[in-house]
């Protein structure tokens, strides 16, 4: 279970058991549950001890604009792994759209450690050619065998990066070169797309002001809400601008000759 945290100033709200004890509200969502915690400042100060007691060692998501209270030991939830999953889902959705218009899409998938073999299998139906760049040759050899059994074709596996120049799309969940780990899909011209706050549709039950991606990630990782594993972004970001998945797919098709 996880919790969300809101900190506010003002008079004691109805239902607060004591003057400075946080309000804890249990909520059900996506087959799991979490606690919505509202902590009130008195004269600009929080009762850190009572806040820590209310939260315990559970992962916590703070409302946007709220920094962890100074001196408060919180287990802040990290959505980094889920953001990579969301990026991969979004990349697959983009390629699926693009494949309706272009069949000659070649994709380079960079996975040095071999931890994303399952995603490589998703590339085969939507890309004419798939190239896997990895140091985990053995893991991907098994993946290639499965792909051949399922699709009659297998990705080309290599530990060299030269193939990137031949590909219309590069997908790298852990980053590539100067790009940070949240950059997932980009063209050879180094225009790339990534996910960030607000890129997915509102998740039912997400408290106001809480990042929807963080909330979906917590439901998936802490509450086993498996349907969150299939979400894709509604848009991705490039150059500070929002682009729909359809627009990204169109751009890829224009880049491919």
Report residues per predicted region.
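Rossmann-like adenosine-cofactor binding region
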Residues: 156-211
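Adenosine-phosphate binding glycine-rich loop
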Residues: 188-257
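Glycine-rich phosphate/diphosphate-binding loop of Rossmann-like nucleotide-binding domains
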Residues: 100-162
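A short, well-structured beta->alpha microelement
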Residues: 21-26, 39-50, 146-168, 175-177
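Metallocofactor- and cofactor-centric catalytic cores in central/energy metabolism, strongly enriched
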Residues: 7-70, 257
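Short, charged/polar "capping" segments at the starts of alpha-helices
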Residues: 13-14, 66-72, 116-118, 137-144, ...
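Short, aromatic/basic amphipathic alpha-helical patches
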Residues: 15-21, 70-76, 122-123, 141-150
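A glycine-rich, Thr/Ser-enriched phosphate-binding loop motif common to dinucleotide/cofactor-binding enzymes
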Residues: 77-94
């Amino acid at each position: 279970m996880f919790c969300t945290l809101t900190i506010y100033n003002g008079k004691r709200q109805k239902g607060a058991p004591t003057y400075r004890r946080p309000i804890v509200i249990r909520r059900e969502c996506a087959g799991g549950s979490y606690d919505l915690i509202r902590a009130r400042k008195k004269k600009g100060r929080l009762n850190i001890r009572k806040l820590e007691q209310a939260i315990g060692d559970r992962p916590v998501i703070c409302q946007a604009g709220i920094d962890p209270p100074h001196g408060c030991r919180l287990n802040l939830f990290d959505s980094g792994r889920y953001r990579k999953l969301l990026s991969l889902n979004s990349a697959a959705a983009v390629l699926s759209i693009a494949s309706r218009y272009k069949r000659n899409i070649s994709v380079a998938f960079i996975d040095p450690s071999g931890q994303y073999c399952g995603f490589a299998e998703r590339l085969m139906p939507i890309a004419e050619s798939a190239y896997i760049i990895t140091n985990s040759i053995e893991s991907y050899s098994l993946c290639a065998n499965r792909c051949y059994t399922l699709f009659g074709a297998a990705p080309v596996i290599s530990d060299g990066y030269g193939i990137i120049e031949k590909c219309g799309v590069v997908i790298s969940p852990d980053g590539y070169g100067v790009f940070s780990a949240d950059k997932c899909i980009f063209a050879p011209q180094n225009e790339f797309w990534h996910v960030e706050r607000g890129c997915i549709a509102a998740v039912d039950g997400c408290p106001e002001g809480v990042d929807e991606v963080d909330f979906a990630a917590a439901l998936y990782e802490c509450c086993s809400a498996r349907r969150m594993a299939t979400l894709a972004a509604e848009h991705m970001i490039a150059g500070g601008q929002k682009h729909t998945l359809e627009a990204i797919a169109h751009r890829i098709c224009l880049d491919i000759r």
